[in-house]
Amino acid sequence: MQNNIKIKKGIESLGVEILSWNPDSQMIKYKVTGTPVCQYDQHSRARVGIKFLDYTVSKEPSYVVYTQVWDTMEKDAEFKKEVYETLAELEDIRNNKHCGEELSGYNLMSRECSYVVEQNIGSLRGQMARRLQFCEEEFIVGLHWLLRQKMIDEGIELAHQFKPMCDVTKKCEYAKADYLSNAFGCLFAGCGRWKSHADYASFNQSCTTPELVKEQTGITCTKSEYELELEKSE
């Protein structure tokens, strides 16, 4: 922390609390904390069978940054200094009543927030299929793996059924989905859960990895049949 500015790493501070579960209606209510505004923005695009409540942006200058940004800050003292100075400058603007209502309420997409979700199991099953895939961003991936584990811990047995879509199709879905353009679909290398068919990737790494999820949340992600077969053959 510097100048009262707090910066948190990736999904280390991510929290998921199951508030209620109704096995008859198959409705779940859960609270998400320690996540950035950009993750809420991505999550709240879901529309069917889901409701978002009590969205609250931190009044304190608390930010959650991508792991790669955090690691860069740790390696580059000058970059870290500039980040804190920029955030402190933004806080001065937010607290200056003479800047006008538009600027005083401005939130960077990395500012910490919390919210509550009410969702039916059909909607959640669809979201899990997409968001458990490591080609998604670390915040949304971490949230859904953590939620899955919390449901299992609460004895909600059907959570064991939740798996990434690529485990259902038994092939890498990245770079070929209809909603991805060819340009966007080759940004990152495949995660290795299934054999990748992409010939080129701008970044020689997956967008998110099971190792990152394990390191920052303590959750061991289940492995695919492909990965287990590879382990047997080694």
Which ranges hold each PLM region?
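Family-specific signature for flavin-dependent thymidylate synthase
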Residues: 1-234
